[in-house]
Regions:
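A short alpha-helical cap/connector motif
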Residues: 1-125, 130-151, 155-206
Length: 206
């Protein structure tokens, strides 16, 4: 028996489909997506920004929680995976809410800022390649409104961020460790890290 939110049938089907995929472990945890959906309803999200779509689980979960006029801006570079995401959006009846940008996310974020979209988003999720995380964060901080939330996935890197790395550690480890340590001192946000999935940090913009 499940305690908490019931999983939408389309999301359940996608999760089952990805269980047998060799990269299926890249998908956001069901509990994390449920939390994002809950947050979207709590703070009445109308515009959602997602960096790293993969096969569309989190974008679908949040889009389902948005009002009919809600908008999702989705950033990715992988056509193969986002084709699955498009199928999922169609099946869930949310494709009309979602705008997919297939180019490096930093380009899309800079375009949005240049187009006057600063402080217009209510919620953002960073769930992409780890080295640019600090750059993604700074752009999202410009794009999210005061009182909005920036969520960052995989902040624990399977627990590796809690330990000193060695010469075999990926560059992303040091970058994420430094970034994580900087958040409590950042006066622009109120951070909290939850041990859900591979670690989810929520940043409330002041």
């Amino acid at each position: 028996n499940t305690i908490g939110q019931a999983e939408h049938p389309v999301l359940a089907a996608l999760r089952e489909r990805m269980l047998s995929h060799r990269l299926g472990n890249m998908a956001i945890a069901r509990e994390q997506a449920a939390l994002l959906s809950w947050l979207a309803q709590l703070i009445r999200v109308e515009k959602y920004l997602e960096i790293g779509v993969f096969t569309g689980y989190s974008s679908t979960a949040v889009a389902l929680a948005l009002p009919e006029h809600g908008k999702v801006t989705a950033c990715d570079i992988n056509v193969t995976f986002t084709d699955i995401a498009r199928e999922t959006w169609r099946a869930a009846g949310v494709e009309h809410k979602i705008s997919l940008h297939l180019q490096p996310a930093l380009l899309t974020l800079d375009d949005l800022i240049a187009q006057g979209e600063a402080e217009s988003y209510d919620l953002a999720l960073i769930d992409a390649d780890k080295p640019p995380t600090p750059q993604y964060f700074e752009r999202c901080l410009k794009l999210v409104r005061k009182g909005g939330i920036i969520a960052i996935d995989n902040v624990l890197l399977n627990g590796r961020v809690l330990h000193e790395g060695d010469e075999h550690s990926p560059p992303s480890l040091k970058i994420l460790q430094t970034f994580n340590r900087s958040l409590p001192e950042d006066k622009r946000i109120v951070p909290i890290t939850l041990p859900v999935g591979d670690g989810l940090t929520l940043l409330l913009k002041k």
